[in-house]
Amino acid sequence: AVGFQVFHFIEHGLQVGYWLLHPKQKPWLTPWAQTGADGLAYWCQLWPGSGRASQRGAEFLHLVGNSVFFAGVMAIFVLARISNTRSRSAQGAVLFQGLHLVEHVILTATVFMTGTGWGASTMFGRWSGTELSTHRVWWHFIVNGIATTIAVVGLVAVYRSGALTGKSLASR
């Protein structure tokens, strides 16, 4: 899950790069992210809701991805606890990614209910156009950078304790 998140963070870095070259254009998705969003958009058009299917697909893709990452962060946290590894990063990753996941639950729900995503990354539905695009591109790049860094530091702490190889658990 952490490797998946590192890849996701790189995608947000590519989005920032695209934005730097084309700040007035619609945010760009990598081809694999666009394929995922389009695939989910197909199913989203079958469900009732207010938002465009493509918008709902993109939000749902982020919700699924952030749920997978949260599960990985929880695994790091549980391994740290079981192995008695003191890692504020494992705890911090759960808190930070938990809040990030809540943001995506709210964004997805509000897109389905009202057609407009409501959350900190959308300035609570108040911005639109390039103002919104700029904020969202940078918001997600920064938030994902922080979440990824905290999770990697927590994972390294758990690895160094031997919990990933079972050494620290076997000695209990």
What are these regions (language model features)?
Residues A1-V16, S89-A109:
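Hydrophobic alpha-helical membrane-insertion segments
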